[in-house]
A protein has these predicted regions:
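Extended, charged catalytic domains and RNA/DNA-binding interfaces, predominantly
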Residues: 1-119, 127-136, 141, 162-171, ...
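Active-site micro-motifs of SAM-dependent methyltransferase domains
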Residues: 81, 150, 221
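Charge-dense, low-complexity intrinsically disordered segments
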Residues: 33, 120, 184, 188
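Short acidic/histidine-rich active-site segments
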Residues: 137-187
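Short, solvent-exposed loop/turn and secondary-structure capping segments
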Residues: 25-26, 66, 155-157, 226
Length: 228
């Protein structure tokens, strides 16, 4: 099955999406038993066929396990440091340091639930977070993973959270009173907002090579090296 997924063109695959799967625990589970026996075999097969392991929605121990088990560096394609904003989807310093040591990539997210002050997060705060992340992980291993759901109706996020796995409503990162897609910060409403990030990073001292790396070149280099 993993080979078939690769043959269809997929080059990244998550082991879990918020909930427990046959492969690993999701970040919303109360108990995180790590990568399962089947998960270990799937990681091995992903390494063989050239699919990058993505642990963006997975729990702490499961993510650390995946970093340790995978022969190739893994990616956390869309998340931020938990130390900056305490969202269950964001990642601990321990994970970021392990990711650094293994050569993995993180894509920093602009999804409001992952941002300090949500929709009201400022570009200055976001760029300071980028600088703080660069103290934990090599700057060449930092990219953007916007998690931008542009133009999607709220029915999409409702299906994503519930799918067919339960009759009761699960609001995930939202709440009963805030169940819809959150409004994006005004500095990143679509891809044109990357220019605002470029300007913000320049203002706090990043040079042109570092900025271009964060905004795309680092992911490009990762693709060239690890996607076959």
């Amino acid at each position: 099955l993993v080979q078939s997924v690769r043959d269809l063109g997929a080059v990244f695959m998550q082991l879990s999406y918020n909930n427990q799967s046959l492969l690993a625990a999701g970040c919303y589970e109360n108990v995180d038993s790590g990568v399962t026996r089947m998960g270990r075999e799937v990681i091995k097969e992903m390494n063989r066929v050239g699919i990058v392991v993505d642990m963006s929605h997975s729990a702490e121990q499961s993510t650390l396990d995946a970093i340790d088990i995978s022969e190739n560096p893994i990616a956390i394609t869309h998340a931020n440091p938990f130390s900056w904003h305490e969202s269950k989807r964001n990642k601990s310093d321990q994970i970021l340091k392990a990711l650094n040591n293994s050569g993995g990539m993180i894509g920093l997210s602009m999804y409001p639930h992952h941002l300090r002050n949500g929709t009201n997060c400022t570009i200055e705060s976001f760029c300071e977070m980028v600088a703080q992340t660069a103290e934990l992980i090599n700057i060449n291993q930092i990219g953007i993973g916007s998690d931008l759901c542009l133009g999607q109706p709220d029915s999409v996020v409702d299906w994503m959270r519930n799918g067919t796995w339960t009759k009761s409503k699960d609001y995930g990162e939202g709440t009963k009173d805030n169940a819809a897609f959150p409004r994006q910060p005004d500095w990143f409403e679509d891809a044109r907002g990357l220019n605002n990030i470029k300007d913000g990073l320049k203002k706090i001292g990043f040079n042109e090579t570092e900025i271009n790396g964060i905004l795309g070149n680092n992911w490009y280099n990762f693709y060239k090296k690890y996607i076959t």
